[in-house]
Amino acid sequence: NWPDIANWLLDKGFSIIPLAKCEDASNCKRPLIQWDEYQRRAPGIEEVRKWVREFKDRLGGFAIVCGKPSGNLLVLGFEHEDAYKWFIENAPGQVRQLLENSMRVLTGVRSDGKRGVHVYVRLPAGYGVRNTDIVLPIQINAEDPHKKEPLNKLEVRFDGRYVVGPGYRHYSGVDYCIAIGPEDTPGELRCQGFVGKPDMALWY
């Protein structure tokens, strides 16, 4: 139910844009609209309903626009959950606590059955981060069968970028899902073993 999912995402303060269905690894995560405007503001629910009607069978889900329009949202994208675990284990205590209590979305499946991880962090107003990719000093004995990218990579995404939101079907055949999130996370967006955090309302 895309309108309900969109309404929930908007209620959590995210600016969203519609994405085309993922047909294969070369034609994935593609916006269905010109999205410059939504780097400055979030759409209204009526705009979203129009997208759902207009794109119908082509709609694969929504992307989350990072940075200021989503409440100063920083997303850390780990290509493999072992890279996420390494980062957490080596992060300073306050950073580790922040990340462990932030919303966590699982992404595509890798060759070893493990998944990528997106961590959503809201920064204080006035703070910003440069978009960048970082190769972490960890060996991961797996691969993405569809793409030739290192799985020890961390993608840092803020203003001017977007990430695929929960509910989207990845080309590996699984849906992006929320592993840790607000207690009112819709059932269709929850990963198996979902953990709801009552205090996450304060994060929004």
Task: Indicate residue ranges for each PLM-predicted region.
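Conserved phosphate/metal-binding and DNA-contacting active-site motifs used
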Residues: 1-204
